Amino acid sequence: MTPDRTLALCDTTLRDGEQTAGVAFSLAEKKAIARALDRAGVAEIEVGIAAMGWAEVAEIRAVVAEIAHATPVVWCRLRMHDLDMAQKTGVKRVHFAVPTSTAQLEGKLRVDRDWILRETAALVFCASDRGLQVSVGAEDASRTDPDFLIRLAEVAAAAGAIRFRIADTLGLLDPLGAFRLVAELSARISLPIEMHAHNDFGMATANTIMAAHAGATHLSVTVNGLGERAGNAACEEVGAALEAGGIDTGLDLCALPELSAVVAKASGRAFRAQKPITGDDWLFAHESGIHVDAILKRADTYEDPRCAPARFGRERQIVIGKHSGSAGLRAALLEAGLPADDAVLDRLKPLLRAHAVRVKRPVEAGDLRRMVARLARPSPRT
């Protein structure tokens, strides 16, 4: 993949993200998420599943009204009813999820491959004939014979599909496997390829990046990696990593913290403190004496500009703790208006380290004042 290439992020927080066990968005929350996604610059937003009923159709219409720039997409099963309901939303892009693995065909649908090919051709042609843009996704593609995936893509293309999605539905691929699968299909089918990765082994983001290197032009993501089981590829991680490599995704990186917070609140799923890009206030904090001494002299010693806090609208923090050295501790003391000579530093460090072990957090200015005051008290006579 060459630098300066453009890739499209297709966010499915409102569809696959909401399929997370126990997650259910209100209409107000859906609108807020849609607005935040649109401000952040994602190319496409899967806005829901119209086949859930008329209430969902009404909500999709309301959500779409909040989207100014991104392309809304309605997700469909391979059923005429789903297409009919999707059309009621007024959305002009639909996606058909097509089961492809033996387990899916035999265990879920009780059909064979020929039936899948016929239904795909018929429904894609029907949707295209109605003036809709259609993408087709191979569900459970990572457990499907690549030759059948190619046949399905050819059938979909002939019927009018504009894109083919590879779904690693159970999150079984590793980065090398993702690269090989996408590279093979990219070389053998005419449709642009979208990668949809799940995170069951913690590799969804890496698999998505490797799919981009292998030729995928569209990448399916969710905010905070929200999604079924272990989740999906995280929008903020995929976007930031690609942008760091010179790949344009259209994302406003400074909008990612707000987007992440909106989804975390609506989903009730807090992300871990050290989550890349959008973690808590300590994410861009430095404590280690070696690091702090260097970064105070020159920021890029331990902060590459491609992942510097300002790139994401964040701020660097120098915190004091067990591993602080003289440079960081002296800076903190001076900032707090406290004495910072070598004698104070030498006496303060043992107190500071014991305090850090006890409280399990960075040492704050108030803590430093109390410790310095303790040092100033006369020692009891023996």
Swiss-Prot record:
**What's any GO biological process attached to this entry?**
carboxylic acid metabolic process
Which UniProt key words apply to this protein? Nitrogen fixation, Transferase
* Catalytic function, reaction form: acetyl-CoA + 2-oxoglutarate + H2O = (2R)-homocitrate + CoA + H(+)
Family matches, as PROSITE patterns: AIPM_HOMOCIT_SYNTH_1 (PS00815), AIPM_HOMOCIT_SYNTH_2 (PS00816), PYR_CT (PS50991)
Which part of the chain is the Pyruvate carboxyltransferase domain? Answer: 7-257
The reply to whether Nucleus figures as a keyword in the UniProt entry is no
Q: What is its EC number?
A: 2.3.3.14
Annotated GO molecular function terms are: homocitrate synthase activity
- Record's InterPro entries? AIPM/Hcit_synth_CS, Aldolase_TIM, LeuA/HCS_post-cat, NifV/FrbC, PYR_CT
Its biological function?
Answer: This protein is a Fe-Mo-cofactor biosynthetic component.
User: What NCBIfam families would the database entry show?
Assistant: nifV_homocitr (TIGR02660)
Give the family per the record: Belongs to the alpha-IPM synthase/homocitrate synthase family.
Q: Which PANTHER family match?
A: HOMOCITRATE SYNTHASE, ISOPROPYLMALATE_HOMOCITRATE_CITRAMALATE SYNTHASE FAMILY PROTEIN
In Swiss-Prot or TrEMBL terms, this protein is called: Homocitrate synthase
Origin organism lineage: Bacteria, Pseudomonadati, Pseudomonadota, Alphaproteobacteria, Rhodobacterales
